[in-house]
Amino acid sequence: MKKQNIPKEISEFITKEEIVMFQELQIKIAELNNKTNLTRLIKGDDYWISQVFDSIWPFKTFPNINFDNKKFLDIGSGCGFPGLAYAITHPNSEIYLIDSSKKKTDALKLLIKEINFKNNIHIINDRIENLAHQSSMRNSFNIATTRAVSNPSTVSEYILPMLKKEGLGVLYCGKWTDEENKNLDKTLEILEGKFKETKKILLPRSKGTRNIILIQPKNLCPEIYPRKIGKPEKHPL
């Protein structure tokens, strides 16, 4: 396997065995990219910082929170980040990867067949607006997240209905302003959710600023949410 310039910040987070798995994942994604346009972030720092590091650091940086042995949901998983990154670093957790694109979920199924994941991994081709109203899925996850949607209010409407009462939503944000904080606070009030904790870092090698916002249910989310397909994105709460 070709030697790569892997950022030291990643080596501080994960084991050598996990690095090997991430290298295998990189190779397989690159192969699948020839048939299915999964991602352009597959080489060098684009992969190791923008994909791997960005996916795993939230689960390594809150020492007071146990992220192991959980039921984990990745909404709009695309090429598998952050879900597969979390799977590699938390092998005792059960993973659900959801995407509305059948091409992408078919590619994800190939990935998990060819890489020796220790987790029980489920791939589902559907919209979260549909799945959230299925009794077998709603209020059943310890952790739910997505990097596919940027608006925190929209993300919250997708995530909170999926969480158990003690569950945790992980929101990936770039900039984080007072106005965004105010808007999210209003949304959480509607969805019966609350803030838990926030953290901000500068990604290595000048890859930008990242804010992580942790939210959780105050009570179970009202049954009417999420709204019908398209509404949470077009008309955030």
Curated annotation (Swiss-Prot):
InterPro entries: rRNA_ssu_MeTfrase_G, SAM-dependent_MTases_sf. It comes from the Bacteria. One of its GO terms (cellular component) is cytosol. One of its GO terms (molecular function) is rRNA (guanine-N7-)-methyltransferase activity. S-adenosyl-L-methionine binds at residues 76, 81, 99-101, 128-129, 147. Keywords: Cytoplasm, Methyltransferase, rRNA processing, S-adenosyl-L-methionine, Transferase. Belongs to the methyltransferase superfamily. RNA methyltransferase RsmG family. This is Ribosomal RNA small subunit methyltransferase G. The lineage of its organism: Bacteria, Bacillati, Cyanobacteriota, Cyanophyceae, Synechococcales.
